[in-house]
Amino acid sequence: QEKCIKYDFQMPSKIPILDCQGFPTLLLLKKRRFQCKSCQKVTVSETPLVKKNCQISQPIWEKVTQLLTENMTNLAIARRLHISVSVVQRKLAQFQFPQDFTKLPKVLSWDEFSRNKGKLAFIAQDFETRHIVTILENNRQASIKNYFYKYPRVVRETVKFVTVDMSGSYIPIIKQLFPRAKIVLDRFHIIQHLSRAMMSTRIDIMKTFDTPSLPYRAMKNHWRILQKDSRKLSQNLFYSRTFGQTLTPKEVVQKTLEFSDQLKFYYDLYQILLFHFQEKNSNYFFELLEDNLNLVNPAFKTVFKTFLKYKTYITNAIELPYSNAKLEATNKLIKDIKRQAFGFRNFKNFKTKIY
């Protein structure tokens, strides 16, 4: 310092820092200049609290990083820390997620989610750790192939199981990408197909009765009870306005089925299929499908043909403990992020926020 000329302090800079006692707080930072007598070089005093040529304090940057990992919009973060949205956006753009093409999880979960304007994005996740393997801008087969072919064949052969929904578009490329992997269809979608067939059948039978009649009103008002697994029906009494008396859900089912033998046939078939599926009796499940294939209506027949087409993959779903449940939970979080931000125009920002 003896070899430097000291100049006066500059005008204080207003540096935002973290709130104090709930009030916005500014740091009035004064900077002093020094000039070396030998080389004539002028320098400015520095502090670890603020980086050089920056007007945002380090605690603010660290807080922005922390809040970006939470389910908050950029605007909400900016308002909370009393900074601009562009500052938050710059920090978001600094996040990097390098890809490791030397390993893949044993169990992969595949699905898609809506990103904007009806466009679907592809997501792959580790079933066991819930770590996101990748998010692609679209769910086209070419895009998925191009990404996973970046992994050496030896690495791709380590994948033993892949869980997918029943759309059928992923099954052909899974066999190409992961030659040693078993395909497991998501159990939720299997049950959903059965449930929709039962609902469609109930509506068709219901429409054969007059609107004011008791059978029509019973099938319409108590449809949830008819859709539910009979083993999970409550034993508690409740007052049914349709029947005008206090009944248990099981008694409601019995009274409703008395109106139609056809409805009783499909209800019993539906419940038996649910039983064998949940008890992991795959042989009985498919025997029941084959025996009743030519006896059921078009709604059930379409579902049965689909199940028989994917018999191997549905058998895996029944016998193995893997499903897309964890990935669906991740998709729920993605939808929450998208809803809070009112959508993302930039897919890169959306992807970074998800990671």
Label every PLM stretch briefly.
Residues K14-K119, V155-V159, P172, I314-T315:
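Short, positively charged, Gly/Tyr-enriched micro-motifs
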Residues P48-Q55, D126-A142:
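Glycine-rich phosphate-binding "P-loop"
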